[in-house]
């Protein structure tokens, strides 16, 4: 029989940092609210959660990396919103935020969760921050809890 390992959704003392971009704040605040509510519902003491605000999604990876390297957190949740405009700037920001968060996770072996919306319109971003399409902040927080509880099991 194969061995199956998976995390669960019980915080059980795990510590979390959230790195939140302020750009498109009307969207990112809803993502943050969803993430914090989810962490609390699964047992987190919000007094033990750190929220780091950065100017925008471009700055998220470096702040996430600093958090991950402290050793104080079992997972880092990245929340932001990038909405396509008329120039290639959207592509550069999305690419940098995506690769930066993934590289941070790989380099530090701390789960760094990608809750950065990359949408064509503001309405799409709003829908993914709590209206029609759920709340991607909640989903990122659930994934963070699951990964935080899985990682110790992988250390063998």
From Swiss-Prot:
Keyword annotations: Riboflavin biosynthesis, Transferase
Question: What's any one GO cellular component for it?
Answer: cytosol
**Active-site residues annotated for this sequence:** 89 (proton donor)
Statement: the UniProt record of this protein carries the keyword Transferase: yes
Catalysed reaction(s) here are:
(2S)-2-hydroxy-3-oxobutyl phosphate + 5-amino-6-(D-ribitylamino)uracil = 6,7-dimethyl-8-(1-D-ribityl)lumazine + phosphate + 2 H2O + H(+)
What SUPFAM superfamilies does this protein map onto? Lumazine synthase
What EC numbers are recorded for this enzyme?
A: 2.5.1.78
Record InterPro entries? LS, LS/RS, LS/RS_sf
Q: What GO molecular function annotation could you give as one example from this UniProt entry? A: 6,7-dimethyl-8-ribityllumazine synthase activity
Q: In which pathway does it act?
A: Cofactor biosynthesis; riboflavin biosynthesis; riboflavin from 2-hydroxy-3-oxobutyl phosphate and 5-amino-6-(D-ribitylamino)uracil: step 1/2
Sites binding 5-amino-6-(D-ribitylamino)uracil sit at: 23, 57-59, 81-83, 114
What broad class of enzyme is this?
transferase
GO BP, one annotated term: riboflavin biosynthetic process
The keyword Acetylation appears for this protein: no
Instruction: Identify the residues that bind (2S)-2-hydroxy-3-oxobutyl phosphate.
Output: 86-87, 128
- What family does this chain come from, according to its entry? Belongs to the DMRL synthase family.
Its annotated function is as follows: Catalyzes the formation of 6,7-dimethyl-8-ribityllumazine by condensation of 5-amino-6-(D-ribitylamino)uracil with 3,4-dihydroxy-2-butanone 4-phosphate. This is the penultimate step in the biosynthesis of riboflavin.
What is this protein's record name?
6,7-dimethyl-8-ribityllumazine synthase
Protein's gene: ribH
């Amino acid at each position: 029989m194969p061995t199956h390992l998976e995390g669960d959704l019980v915080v059980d003392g795990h510590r979390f940092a959230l790195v939140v971009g302020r750009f498109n704040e009307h969207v990112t605040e809803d993502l943050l609210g969803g993430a914090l509510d989810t962490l609390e519902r699964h047992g987190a003491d919000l007094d033990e959660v750190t929220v780091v605000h950065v100017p925008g999604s471009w700055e998220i990876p470096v702040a996430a990396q600093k958090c991950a390297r402290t050793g104080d957190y079992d997972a880092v949740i990245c929340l932001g919103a990038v909405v396509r405009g008329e120039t290639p700037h959207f592509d550069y920001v999305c690419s940098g935020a995506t690769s930066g968060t993934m590289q941070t996770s790989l380099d530090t072996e701390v789960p760094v969760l990608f809750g950065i919306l990359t949408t064509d319109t503001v309405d799409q971003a709003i829908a993914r921050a709590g209206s029609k399409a759920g709340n991607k902040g909640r989903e990122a927080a659930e994934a963070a809890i699951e990964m935080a509880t899985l990682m110790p099991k992988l250390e063998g």
